[in-house]
């Protein structure tokens, strides 16, 4: 979708922009593919906060997305491109030849009226899903499985894509959008093309209220808290951290501290790590 810039009539709208929704062809979702979505405000079943800065937000319904694409050799026609409030990517409504309907992530270039298919013998074209072993080297892919039959887990957000770099017996090499090169089982499936809505990264909220609509509450800096609330708190005026390294609210090292386990089983499948910023090297 394109980006629409608003006139600066108020301070909140001065730099604000939003989607123009030019690609959206249907505004009401398919009722049979909806599920209730309860907001928990970051609390668990005991009512205790497990994730900070969450709460409120607009009510929304979950769109049931087909990440598995296991309906093989049955062609489906793209009936509509819809907005999904639960993710950054748009979704496409498919109507299969046998009468069933489903939602998929809308790849870039997918239009209403186009036909998509899944299965080992599907053509190499945008929107088709195949096992990785059947996809040519160099192809751009998205919605990649990590376990056969589990459904796509990688490369699902707006504008992202991965590339198939090579094949080895049971595994294939895939370069993810982070720059990481990873070995994935060749029996896992992926969808051809890159995710659409690639201008999402240019979105400017412009005011705090748009974060509140999304269920995001204010993120208060530790340096403006009291010493009993945060390790960075206290002091006269704008005091520095006063510690060898920044700490989390619970006293753990943060900013550049690696949190991934050195014993993780999946470490052996990472051929090359992701690109890192200067503060994490």
Swiss-Prot record:
Record Gene3D superfamilies: 2.30.30.30, Nucleic acid-binding proteins (2.40.50.140), Ribosomal protein L2, domain 3 (4.10.950.10)
Keyword Ribosomal protein listed: yes
A Pfam family recorded for this sequence: Ribosomal_L2_C
Positions of region (Disordered): 208-281
UniProt keyword terms in alphabetical order: Ribonucleoprotein, Ribosomal protein, RNA-binding, rRNA-binding
InterPro entries to which the protein is assigned, alphabetical: NA-bd_OB-fold, Rib_uL2_dom2, Ribosomal_uL2, Ribosomal_uL2_bac/org-type, Ribosomal_uL2_C, Ribosomal_uL2_CS, Ribosomal_uL2_dom3, Ribosomal_uL2_RNA-bd_dom
GO MF, one example: structural constituent of ribosome
GO terms under biological process: cytoplasmic translation
Keyword Ribonucleoprotein set for record: yes
Biased segments, Basic residues type: 254-281
UniProt subunit comment: Part of the 50S ribosomal subunit. Forms a bridge to the 30S subunit in the 70S ribosome.
Family membership noted in the UniProt record: Belongs to the universal ribosomal protein uL2 family.
Purpose: One of the primary rRNA binding proteins. Required for association of the 30S and 50S subunits to form the 70S ribosome, for tRNA binding and peptide bond formation. It has been suggested to have peptidyltransferase activity; this is somewhat controversial. Makes several contacts with the 16S rRNA in the 70S ribosome.
Protein name: Large ribosomal subunit protein uL2
Top-level taxonomy: Bacteria, Bacillati, Bacillota, Bacilli, Lactobacillales
């Amino acid at each position: 979708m394109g980006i629409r810039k608003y006139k600066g009539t108020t301070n909140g709208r001065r730099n604000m922009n939003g989607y123009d929704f030019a690609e959206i062809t249907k505004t009401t979702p398919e009722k049979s593919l909806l599920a209730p979505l309860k907001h928990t405000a970051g609390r668990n079943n005991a009512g205790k906060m497990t994730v900070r800065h969450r709460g409120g937000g607009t009510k929304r319904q979950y769109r049931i997305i087909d990440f598995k694409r296991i309906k093989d050799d049955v062609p489906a026609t793209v009936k509509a491109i819809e907005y999904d409030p639960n993710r950054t990517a748009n979704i496409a409504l498919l109507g299969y030849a046998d009468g069933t309907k489903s939602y998929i992530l809308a790849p870039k270039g997918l239009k209403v009226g186009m036909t998509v298919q899944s299965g080992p013998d599907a053509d190499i074209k945008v929107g088709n899903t195949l096992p990785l072993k059947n996809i040519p080297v160099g192809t751009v892919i998205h919605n990649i499985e990590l376990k056969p039959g589990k459904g796509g887990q990688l490369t699902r957000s707006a504008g992202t894509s991965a590339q198939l770099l090579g094949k080895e017996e049971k595994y294939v090499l895939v370069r993810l959008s982070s720059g990481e090169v990873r070995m994935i089982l060749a029996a896992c499936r992926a969808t051809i093309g890159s995710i659409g809505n690639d201008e999402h990264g240019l979105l400017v909220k412009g005011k705090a209220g748009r974060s509140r609509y999304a269920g995001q509450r204010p993120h208060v800096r530790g340096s403006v808290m009291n010493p009993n609330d945060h390790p960075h708190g206290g002091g006269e005026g704008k005091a520095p951290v006063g510690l060898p390294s920044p700490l989390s609210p619970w006293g753990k090292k943060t900013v550049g501290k690696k949190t991934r386990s050195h014993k993780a089983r999946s470490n052996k499948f990472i051929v090359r790590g992701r690109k890192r910023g200067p503060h994490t090297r």
